[in-house]
Structures are given as C-alpha cells and as structure tokens.
Amino acid sequence: MIQLPPTPLHDLNPAFHQEFSSMSWSALHAMPSTTSVGPSLKEVNTFSQHKSHSIFHHGAEIEQQNKFRQEKVIISAPLDYLGSLPGKDIRGKLISAFNEWFKIPEEKLEVIKRVVGLLHVASLLYVHEIQHTHFEPSLTKPSKSLYRIDDIQDSSKLRRGLPVAHNIFGVAQTINSANYAYFRAQSELFTLGKPQALDIFTEELLRLHRGQGMDLYWRDSLICPTEEEYLEMVANKTGGLFRLAIKLIQLESENTMDCVPLVDLLGVIFQIRDDYQNLQSDQYAKNKGFGEDITEGKFSYPIIHSIRKDNGNSQLMNILRQKTEDEDVKRYTIQIIESTGSFEYTRQKLISLTAQARALLKSLGVDQSSGLASILEFLELKQ
C-alpha cells in the first residue's frame, strides 16, 4: 500500500483559515474574542465540525418548529372552527363577574378563562358531537345515515346556525381534537404555579364525566330518572366547568368567600333553562335544530316531569325510543309535554331557583348592579 506523506499545515487551503477571523470565532463562542495564537489544525477541524453541526442543528430546529406549527393547525382545526362560531361566552362573562369580588391578577384570570374555554369546546366536540352519535348494534361500521348529530352526542346538525364540526372534519379527527384540548387545558394549569390546581382540575373533570355518563346511560337504556337524580347529574355535569373556574379563582385570591353553592345553583339554572329552550324557543330551533332533545332521545327536565306526571307516559317513552327526526312527530311530542303542565312546571322551577340565587347574592353582600346580577337577569326566561 502506498503511504502518502502527511499534508503540511501551510499546504491546506488558505481560504479556509482566512474565512474565520477571531471575531467570527468569538461571535460563535468557539474561542475568546482575542488571542495571540493562531488555530491549530485540530482547532480548525473542531470548529468546522462545530459550525456544520450548529448550522444543521439550527436548520433542523426551525424545520421542526414549522412542522409543529403545521400539525397544531391541523389537530386544532375542529377546536378553532367551533371557537370561531358566534356565541354569548356566558362562561367567560361569569368568570369576569366573580373576579369583581376576588380581584386576582388579570394574567391569572386569562389562564383560567383559557382552561375553561378549552374544556367547554372539548365538551361540545366530544360530549355533544361524538357521544351523541348512534350506531345500529348489528353493524360494526356505521354508515353516514346512522350518525345522529347534535354535535355527535345530541343528534343535532347545527351549532349556532352552522354545521357541526364533525360534519366538516369527520368523527375521528373531531374526537382527537377534543382529547387534545383536554391536555392543552391541563398544560395551561402549570402557568398558575399551584400544585392544588391540578387536583381541582382532576376532581371536577371526574365529576363532569360521572354526570355525563349517567345522562348517556339513561338515554341509551331508556330509563327515566327521577327529578332528584336528574338535578344531581346536572350539578356534576353542567356545574363542573363553573365550579372548576371558581375554585381556581379562589385558589389565586386572598378572599376566602365560598361561592361554590352559588355556582352549583347557577349550573342547574343554566341546564334547566337550556332544556326548556330546546323545546320552546324559535331562536334555539334556528341555531341548533327543532326539538333536538326529542331526536336525541334525551330525558330533559320537562320530559322527565311529563313522564312522571302521566304514570310513565308510554307514548312519550315510545317516541323517545324512536329518536325521530320527523318534525310533525316532534310537534305532537311537544303537545304531550304541554298537556301534562310540564313547561309551566319548568318555568316555575326556574323562577324559584333564580330567587334562591338572588337571595344567595344578597347574603354574600353582592350589589344588584354587579356582573353576577346581570348574568342572572340574562338567564331569566323572557315571556
């Protein structure tokens, strides 16, 4: 084998050495800013590798960041779509109203709003859009005609007058986006810097899913709950995000006032009002579809009262079993519910609950011109 003599340092390409002044080395933190000794061959080779690695690493990092941003846009698309739909943002207003008392820093309040907002949108995607999808038990793969949409759980085809997310992005992508939102919300909690925040988050999500589980069980098993069972379920499910928000606010505040009983009451008012509007409001029908609780087969507050008042109300139970989309059948169903005095009973229940909430506000020393008083006024049924 022919042995080549080692190449002397002065025979190496001089341009390579001239390319990097001591200033260049210093800027890249490869050596001190001034030196009286020129780089040795070993130093030159080391720097060359360092520069190549740095450039490659920087480029790869930028590429990875761009890829992550693109993936985030794709994964979050159903969330962003639903979040862009017009709405009253009652939860955000409620959080701001409670902070009139607790006065936590605005940056902390915004974190709590983001957490609750993400969980709310996730619940709309997953609880309402996905879990309300019905499949024929004899089929292993559902066809398009078998999707019942209220977002997937409620059977509705509209949300705020526009198509539900899973009709645009598909069921699988919508499920994934909802789960992604749960973990994004959880990651936001770490910015609060309070270990107890994660305990509160976990406790309330467990309660929320327990409530939702019972709601689905009654619907899918065609079991009509008692009024007391329904109110307990609502306190767990609908009250969950309200309770999460107020507990996180209280965690950040020096104010020791306990507002959880008030929040629980507001959650019940909110849900019963929604049940009533679903079957009685023209605007609700325009935004979400006519009589969607009937199509879903849901045991809502007025429906439960009607069934219990009429000794099981076999007609109403049979209609719920059918999960009908026929508007004439749904109009007849509403007549049945009206005939048992169930809408009037629901109105009176809301009046009673609202009076209790006002009394609680007064006992807490809340001004009637406050944000919370305004929210209660908004929740009152307008005849």
From Swiss-Prot:
Pfam families: polyprenyl_synt
Catalysed transformations (reactions): isopentenyl diphosphate + dimethylallyl diphosphate = (2E)-geranyl diphosphate + diphosphate; isopentenyl diphosphate + (2E)-geranyl diphosphate = (2E,6E)-farnesyl diphosphate + diphosphate; isopentenyl diphosphate + (2E,6E)-farnesyl diphosphate = (2E,6E,10E)-geranylgeranyl diphosphate + diphosphate
Residues the record lists as binding Mg(2+) 3: D274
Cofactor(s) this protein cannot do without: Mg(2+)
Pathway terms, separated by semicolons: Secondary metabolite biosynthesis; terpenoid biosynthesis
Xref: InterPro entries: Isoprenoid_synthase_dom_sf (IPR008949), Polyprenyl_synt (IPR000092), Polyprenyl_synt_CS (IPR033749)
Main function: Geranylgeranyl pyrophosphate synthase; part of the cluster that mediates the biosynthesis of shearones, diterpenoid pyrones (DPs) which are structurally diverse meroterpenoids consisting of a diterpene linked by a pyrone, and which may exhibit a range of bioactivities.
Family to which this protein belongs: Belongs to the FPP/GGPP synthase family.
Annotated protein name in UniProt: Geranylgeranyl pyrophosphate synthase esdpD
